[in-house]
């Protein structure tokens, strides 16, 4: 079975890992980094991904970051006149991860395990699966990030039973999961979280502070200047990271904007104390989900054996201090918070292929599932933190006499009223025979698969008539849309490959022109004038072709010039060899004299030896 890669598709950074020799290994990207910024840029029809796109963001307005925050919504990014869904942008990132994983492994990769925040709802999970499909990946499993982290942490610790709490604060989402580890079984007891809390929010607090300080000093609102805002974003992220290691950092942005008197510069010293003050409310928001997860698992803080920190934002000292204070124990720091999720996904890939044995993963659904019933109430069929895969059925009836159809409004959430929860979808069971209200028996069944994706079925028990749907939110893509996006992605990949080949061809041609100029100088007076003119003419033709975009012509002229230069080089070597031979002949004539000299020296040495004796 071909390898299944593990992908952590993050809000700010992504990573890819693979199982090799029974161990999960992070695959470095072409720049040598172990994580890749989840940033996509479009410039003159070309796509840039990762660090390149992030660096260019200051000058390129067509740059998209933190797209994960829009997964499962109707959000669209319009770039160069084309609308992109979050799934398409995520697919571009996945395609890039896939391509460098293939380069590393030396084989085609078409299967992956992709992680999502534990608190992702059905629409967000479905969108992630669609993104994988668009990128040309068969998504073997969608698993929760904290669960993946626990897998990576606990692979070599399965002989001892322990309860672990995974505290996962990433770039855009926050999750807490509590798991039981023992005898190769990783069982999730509870999960809680906040999909609107992450490192991006900490950055924004710094940005808002810098904007306010600058406005106070200069009367100019930098938030209205896109380029200045991008520079502030980069500076805020850097300052946040710096303050994890030092207590004070200098934010210096020269020429941030211009006032009436000329250029203006931003110079601010940000202390860790000030940063903690600015972000206090964000850190506090991690406490409620932590307590909720403990409550749902029927555990207290003292029952937790180990606290695992996941996600780059857990490096923030105030976050570490808060979790330590809340749970009364020092968090475990033996795993890399940026890499552990992708490694866990790779291990899950190994479980699927059979390379990892005696490991069982029991995950849970993060949110309750149900339908709307009379009075706009949500009736729950599957409670949150139910182990998946699972299915549950319940029988309902009609609300009016002779009701011909039943509308099934599928919901996900914890609020008692339907309107306050997330709508996953709607469908209708029609052709119910006329009968008084309360008589027809309508069985509604929910089925959640191992990826946490929901299928709902409604059946009229009287007639046996049945209707079912795999839930897709209003933002979900149709099979036709996904297929079109797959084709677009493949075409773009082909185009990207062609662009790369053309760039290499142009570079090689430029290099050849340079080499020819150098060679012709060396050949001056050594080969016939006619040969030189022929080479110069071919070189000029290639230079002319390089001014245009006809790559077939560039290739043809390059090949032609190459052939001429090779012939010239052969002649040069032949000439050099002839000269060397002539020189060798001259040396041969002097050889006897040389022999005499050598003999004389030899005699002298012998005489000396005799004297010494």
Swiss-Prot record:
Cited Pfam families: HSP70 (PF00012)
The keyword Transferase appears for this protein: no
Induction: By stress conditions e.g. heat shock.
Comp. bias intervals (Low complexity): 578-591
Gene Ontology MF, one: unfolded protein binding
InterPro entries reported in the protein's UniProt record: ATPase_NBD (IPR043129), Chaperone_DnaK (IPR012725), Heat_shock_70_CS (IPR018181), HSP70_C_sf (IPR029048), HSP70_peptide-bd_sf (IPR029047), Hsp_70_fam (IPR013126)
Family that this chain belongs to: Belongs to the heat shock protein 70 family.
Protein name (Swiss-Prot/TrEMBL): Chaperone protein DnaK
Organism, as annotated: Listeria innocua serovar 6a (strain ATCC BAA-680 / CLIP 11262)
């Amino acid at each position: 079975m071909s390898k299944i890669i593990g992908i952590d598709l993050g809000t700010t950074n992504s990573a890819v890992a693979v199982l090799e020799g029974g161990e999960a290994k992070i695959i470095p990207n072409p720049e040598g980094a172990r994580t890749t910024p989840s940033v996509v840029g479009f410039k003159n029809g070309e796509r840039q991904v990762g660090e390149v796109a992030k660096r260019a963001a200051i000058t390129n307005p067509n740059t998209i970051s933190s797209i994960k925050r829009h997964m499962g919504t109707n959000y669209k990014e319009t770039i160069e006149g084309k609308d992109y869904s979050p799934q398409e942008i995520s697919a571009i990132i996945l395609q890039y991860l896939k391509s460098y994983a293939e380069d590393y492994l030396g084989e085609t990769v078409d299967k992956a395990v992709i992680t999502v925040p534990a608190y992702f709802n059905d629409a967000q999970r479905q969108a992630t699966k669609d993104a994988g499909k668009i990128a040309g990946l068969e998504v073997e499993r969608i698993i929760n990030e904290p669960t993946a982290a626990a897998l990576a942490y606990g692979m070599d610790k399965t002989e001892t039973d322990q309860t672990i709490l995974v505290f996962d604060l990433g770039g855009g989402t926050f999750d807490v999961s509590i798991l039981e580890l023992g005898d190769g079984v990783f069982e999730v007891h509870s999960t809680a979280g906040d999909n609107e809390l992450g490192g991006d929010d900490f950055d924004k607090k710094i940005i808002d502070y810098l904007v306010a300080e600058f406005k106070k000093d200069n009367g100019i609102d930098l938030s209205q200047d896109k380029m200045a805002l991008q520079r502030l974003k980069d500076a805020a992220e850097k300052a946040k990271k710096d303050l994890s290691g030092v207590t004070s950092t200098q934010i210096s942005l020269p020429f941030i904007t211009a006032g009436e008197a000329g250029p203006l510069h931003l110079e601010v010293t940000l202390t860790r104390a000030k940063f903690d003050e600015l972000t206090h409310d964000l850190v506090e928001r991690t406490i409620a989900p932590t307590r909720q997860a403990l409550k749902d698992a029927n555990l207290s803080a003292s029952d937790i054996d180990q606290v695992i920190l996941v996600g780059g934002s857990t490096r923030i000292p105030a976050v570490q201090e808060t979790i330590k204070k809340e749970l009364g124990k020092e968090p475990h720091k033996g795993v890399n918070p940026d890499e552990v999720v992708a490694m866990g996904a790779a291990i899950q890939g190994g479980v699927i292929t059979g390379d990892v044995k005696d490991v069982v993963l029991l995950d849970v659904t993060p949110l309750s599932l149900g339908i709307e019933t009379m009075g706009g109430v949500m009736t729950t069929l599957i409670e949150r933190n139910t182990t998946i895969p699972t299915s549950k059925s319940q029988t309902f009836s009609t609300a009016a006499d002779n009701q011909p159809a039943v509308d099934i409004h599928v919901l996900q959430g914890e609020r008692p009223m339907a309107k306050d929860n997330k709508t996953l979808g709607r469908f209708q069971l029609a052709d119910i025979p006329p009968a008084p209200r309360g008589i027809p028996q309508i069985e509604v069944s929910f089925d959640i698969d191992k990826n946490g994706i929901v299928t709902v079925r409604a059946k009229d028990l009287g007639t046996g008539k049945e209707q079912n749907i795999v839930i897709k939110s209003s933002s979900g893509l149709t099979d036709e849309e996904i297929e079109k996006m797959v084709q677009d992605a493949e075409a773009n990949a082909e185009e990207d490959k062609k662009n790369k080949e053309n760039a290499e061809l142009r570079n090689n041609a430029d290099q050849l022109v340079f080499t020819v100029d150098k060679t012709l100088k060396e050949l001056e007076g050594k080969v016939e004038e006619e040969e030189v003119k022929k080479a110069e003419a071919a070189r000029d033709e290639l230079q002319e072709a390089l001014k245009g975009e006809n790559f077939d012509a560039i290739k043809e002229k390059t090949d032609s010039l190459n052939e001429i230069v090779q012939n010239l080089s052969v002649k040069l070597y032949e000439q050099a060899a002839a000269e060397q031979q002539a020189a060798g002949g001259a040396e041969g004539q002097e050889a006897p004299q040389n022999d005499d000299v050598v003999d004389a020296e030899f005699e002298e040495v012998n005489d000396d030896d005799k004297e010494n004796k």
